[in-house]
Design a protein with these regions (language model features):
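Non-catalytic, mobile gating and regulatory segments of ester bond hydrolases
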Residues: 1-157
Length: 157
């Protein structure tokens, strides 16, 4: 059965201008934010931006192998590498990268914005990973009306 890696092989040569953004593209961009691009994607929203291809090249030069932990699939770096090398995603501009883990407040928050060729912005939020902080935050959601990461997400937008 085909998967999103196969989709990148099949449709990676088509830009988002040639074929409109679709559900599979949405899934791919959502998955990209699971790779920790701290130091490789700019934190600000000013004019400093890098392409996905540039961020991947810098990341891979620093981390030729990556352990994604228990919950996040090991295929994420493969997905990002494939996406970065395509005409469809390689030139997407990254900005606003945040990766905040705070043991004291039991908060895990990560987000990134990707600029699409039509001028729209795609915002991706990372979910829980396998850190103790992430698990504690999940448990806190069961009995706390609002956790810090929810406030961070609202502020991010």
């Amino acid at each position: 059965m085909a998967n999103i890696l196969d989709y990148l092989d099949w449709r990676g040569d088509l830009t988002l201008s040639e074929r409109a953004f679709n559900e599979v593209d949405n899934l791919i961009l959502a998955e990209i934010c699971y790779l920790d691009l701290s130091g490789f994607a700019p934190a600000g929203f000013d004019t400093q931006q890098v392409t996905l291809r540039e961020a991947w090249d810098a990341y891979f030069a620093a981390h030729p192998t990556t352990d994604m932990g228990v919950l996040v699939p090991d295929q994420i770096p493969v997905l990002v590498q494939k996406a970065a090398q395509t005409a469809r995603f390689g030139s997407l501009r990254l900005l606003g990268y945040v990766n905040r883990i705070d043991e004291e407040t039991q908060t895990q928050f990560s987000a990134m914005t990707m600029l699409l060729p039509d001028g729209s912005a795609y915002v991706a939020f990372r979910g829980t990973d396998d850190t103790i902080v992430g698990w504690k935050e999940d448990f806190n959601m069961a009995f706390t009306p609002e956790i810090p990461a929810q406030r961070y997400a609202a502020d991010y937008l």
